[in-house]
């Protein structure tokens, strides 16, 4: 049985033991508070056109995202009506969840060590930063996560993963994520 009182995620321990020192040496930080760290990870599934015809699809996306994240996901709703898409205001269009703390480190560990190697023809992720030290990536199928039972899903959803850091530059954020074993391809 897992002792949750004394449990520390593997990547969180690695950050405090080795990654902090490596980042401090690499960028010459004078204070430990200058060292970039992970702030949160946001997961998003947009159920798209399927949810316009059937509102249960957004609920299905929410259940799958809850299983992946280990935390309750919320259903996202349309902000305004768009007649061309047959979309009405407050209509469910997807699901999202924000991970912080230990769950964030656990998810990042599962993402880099379990889910990404299961992606077909995987050659690494493209370094996609926003200029302020935040990283975003997309996955074509959410079924690469072991929490999803392939036999019970009706749709293979695409998924957005946004990793928010306290880094000021993209170089700092890329180095931080590389220390967390993020497999960049370039």
Curated annotation (Swiss-Prot):
GO terms for cellular component: ribonucleoprotein complex; ribosome. Keywords: Ribonucleoprotein, Ribosomal protein, RNA-binding, rRNA-binding, tRNA-binding. The keyword ATP-binding does not apply. GO terms for molecular function: rRNA binding; structural constituent of ribosome; tRNA binding. InterPro entries: Ribosomal_uL5, Ribosomal_uL5_bac-type, Ribosomal_uL5_C, Ribosomal_uL5_CS, Ribosomal_uL5_dom_sf, Ribosomal_uL5_N. SUPFAM superfamilies: RL5-like. Pfam families: Ribosomal_L5, Ribosomal_L5_C. GO terms for biological process: translation. It comes from the Bacteria. Transmembrane segments: none annotated. Part of the 50S ribosomal subunit; part of the 5S rRNA/L5/L18/L25 subcomplex. Contacts the 5S rRNA and the P site tRNA. Forms a bridge to the 30S subunit in the 70S ribosome. NCBIfam families: PRK00010.1. PANTHER family: 60S RIBOSOMAL PROTEIN L11-RELATED. Belongs to the universal ribosomal protein uL5 family. This is one of the proteins that bind and probably mediate the attachment of the 5S RNA into the large ribosomal subunit, where it forms part of the central protuberance. In the 70S ribosome it contacts protein S13 of the 30S subunit (bridge B1b), connecting the 2 subunits; this bridge is implicated in subunit movement. Contacts the P site tRNA; the 5S rRNA and some of its associated proteins might help stabilize positioning of ribosome-bound tRNAs. This is Large ribosomal subunit protein uL5. It comes from Jannaschia sp. (strain CCS1). The lineage of its organism: Bacteria, Pseudomonadati, Pseudomonadota, Alphaproteobacteria, Rhodobacterales.
């Amino acid at each position: 049985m897992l002792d949750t009182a004394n449990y520390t995620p593997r990547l969180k321990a690695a950050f405090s033991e080795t990654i902090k020192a490596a980042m401090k040496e690499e960028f010459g930080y004078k204070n430990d508070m200058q060292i970039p760290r992970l702030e949160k990870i946001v997961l998003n599934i947009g159920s798209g056109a399927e949810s316009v015809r059937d509102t249960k699809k957004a609920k299905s996306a929410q259940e799958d995202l809850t299983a992946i994240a280990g935390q309750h996901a919320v259903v996202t709703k349309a902000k305004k009506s768009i007649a061309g898409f047959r979309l009405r205001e407050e209509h469910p269009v997807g699901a999202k969840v924000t991970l912080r703390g230990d769950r964030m480190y656990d998810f990042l560990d599962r993402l880099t060590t379990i889910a990404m190697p299961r992606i077909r023809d995987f050659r690494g992720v493209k370094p996609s930063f926003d200029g302020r030290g935040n990283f975003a990536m997309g996955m074509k199928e959410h079924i690469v996560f072991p929490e999803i039972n392939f036999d019970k899903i009706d749709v293979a959803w695409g998924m957005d993963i946004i990793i928010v850091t306290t880094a000021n530059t993209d170089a700092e954020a890329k180095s931080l994520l590389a220390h967390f074993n993020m497999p960049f391809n370039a």
